[in-house]
Amino acid sequence: MFNLLPAFSLGVLLIVMEGRGSAVNTPASRPVTRKSKSYGRSCVEAPSYFWQTPGHLTVLKVPTSRGAAKSQIITNKVDPEHIALLVKNEWKLSYVTPLHHFRHTQLKSYAKHLSAFIVAEKQQGVAVEVGLDAGFKVTFTAVLGLAETDEDAETVFIQIQSKPVFAAAADAPKVVWRGWLTCVNGDPEYLRSLPPDFVSLPLFCTSGPESLTNLVKSWFERAFDCNFGSLALNSSTLNWLAALWTGCHPACNIRYLKLSWSLPTEPPLDVLYTVNPQDAWELWNSIHPQENTDDRIDIKDVQAFMSGMETHFFRHFKIHLSAGTLLKVSTALGSAHHDGKIKIGNSDYITTLLALLTECALLKMPT
């Protein structure tokens, strides 16, 4: 790490790359905005593609401001064992359109159907994972307490267990896949516009073999007439996370702020920019003072924060980071990558992260 004027510490790594390439209720019934056709939901039926037009289409706008990140002891309202399942792991993100006739009261039934579906697909020759037994145990669990509004549906956590082929009879099955669907502070106008037989859990996070992820998605699409898509995180989203997490430093030491850029040079140039957390916060505080009574953060504040760091970097290295693509942001609170991978490092700020990702998922869905 270099001590550079003006009172701003950073570490820089430049890499030149050559040739790289339960008994839970779903949200209360909402006003029906139009009549919907009834579609089957058997796990063996082809999807009806009703997901393309689930009720009146609401134009979702990208917010230009949002509330500052606030710490909350999430374990006061969410089972600590459930929270432990969400933190520390790396999750791959997808969006999913509203689920037709999904019911939180039917989770045990869904677990049985998904387990049978995976076994049937494997027996038909679908590659699952080398070394796994033919039997799979699937569990669906409602994670109560993450929902922030009456319109938010409760989070659903899915876990798949299996035994290795040569495991002893007494050996316990091992967890081979995890995933969860969530909605935190979803756009209320959009959620209210959905017909009453739809549930929106737009953010899908997975950890495990891609083959199992694909099977789980396939089952959901057949069972609930929904559709999945990849969820990449653009530079604007990463900028927001950098600013929101930096603003948390006085209350919770973020330990570091690491930013990774890719620059379109020949050969390509990767830049890892590590900023002292106190210096990053002082820059942020000069733009959005801590004593400000308005806890709303404007996009202009975020842009000024990132511009300040880019300007400081250029002053010393004569490299325009703004010409490249921001790929990753990480602090002790969590990390997020451009390709749609996240890690939750601190549960006290999980609501801020999930609210932003829920927004990204809703904006990415087809209209």
Swiss-Prot record:
The keyword Nucleus applies. GO terms for cellular component: chromosome, centromeric region; nucleus. Keywords: Centromere, Chromosome, Nucleus. Belongs to the CENP-L/IML3 family. Probable component of a centromeric complex involved in assembly of kinetochore proteins, mitotic progression and chromosome segregation. Its main location: nucleus. It is found in: Nucleus; Chromosome, Centromere. This is Centromere protein L. Disulfide bonds: none annotated. The keyword Nucleus applies.
